[in-house]
Design a protein with these regions (language model features):
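Hydrophobic face of amphipathic alpha-helices that form TPR/SEL1-like repeat modules
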Residues: 1-70
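Glycine-rich loop-to-alpha-helix module at the N-terminal edge of alpha/beta enzyme cores
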Residues: 55, 60-61, 66-160
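Hydrophobic, small-residue-rich alpha-helical packing segments that form membrane-like cores
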Residues: 146, 150-175, 180-181
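Aromatic-residue-lined binding/catalytic grooves and analogous aromatic/hydrophobic interfacial grooves
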Residues: 187
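Conserved coil-to-alpha-helix start sites within the AMP-binding
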Residues: 190-200
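Conserved short alpha-helical elements in the N-terminal third of ANL/AMP-binding
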Residues: 200-207
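A short hydrophobic/small-residue beta-strand
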Residues: 211-212
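Single conserved hydrophobic/aromatic residue that forms the stacking wall/gate
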Residues: 220, 224-228
Length: 228
């Protein structure tokens, strides 16, 4: 038992990198763009942490170059959807009872990975899968998503603190308990923003909910890179 009231690091907005000629971030991004452009990624469904290759394959192409295939996506059917729901509900007891600061710590670590070693990878997948410029990708898939995970972790603390009743009558001690949903959250996310696509399922998870994430069919490469 921890006798403390944890407070996450004070969130700050992630600085936007410039990608100027000769800069480190530009060189890393160019390398990653070449790598991802030169391969066709086989993307499975992810169910209970396991890769599931269904064989029902749809090719993903660059929006700005329809002749360039960048991924082969294994689509989920009824069997896979039901398995994903069962897996989410199977994790409910463990995840919903985990201390909120432990859940927040997972996403704060993810934000640090994104701002460092995974930044070029995520930005490159957004550029290739959504036809965004390096600056658009940097603002969206890197900075905004980093900010979502940082600020949402602190917002969780605020929710747990601010919802406590301000007054307790004599001989009573009022308190409020914020509980996750009993079911699961089904997140159907848009094509145009990498950050929003990742934020919809993850903000629910920070608050103790389990879920099933269904990215829009046009941007599976970007979603897969974000998840992994």
């Amino acid at each position: 038992m921890v006798n403390s009231i944890p407070k996450p690091p004070t969130p700050v907005n992630e600085p936007v990198l410039g990608y100027l000629p000769g800069s480190k971030e530009r060189a890393e991004l160019e390398t990653e763009l070449k790598r991802q452009s030169s391969e066709i990624l086989e993307i499975p469904c992810i169910i209970n942490g396991e890769e599931v290759f269904t064989g029902d394959v749809v090719e993903q192409v660059m929006p700005h170059n329809h002749g360039h295939v960048i991924a082969r996506v294994h689509m989920a059917g009824e069997k896979e959807v039901n398995a994903a729901i069962d897996a989410a509900m199977g994790a409910h007891a463990m995840w919903s009872t985990m201390p909120w600061q432990a859940r927040a710590a997972i996403f704060l670590k993810a934000s640090e990975m994104l701002r460092g070693p995974r930044r070029a990878e995520i930005n490159a997948s957004t550029m290739l899968n959504q036809s965004k410029t390096c600056h658009q990708a940097e603002i969206d898939s890197a900075c905004e998503l980093i900010d979502f995970w940082r600020f949402n972790s602190d917002y969780a603390r605020q929710i747990y603190e601010d919802l406590q009743p301000p007054i307790s009558p004599s001989s009573m001690w009022n308190s409020s308990e914020v509980r996750p949903l009993e079911g699961f959250v089904f997140s159907v996310t848009p094509f145009n923003f990498s950050s929003i696509a990742a934020n919809l399922p993850s903000c629910a998870a920070i608050m103790g909910n389990v879920g099933v994430w269904k990215p829009v069919s046009y941007t599976h490469l970007r979603a897969h890179e974000t998840y992994t």
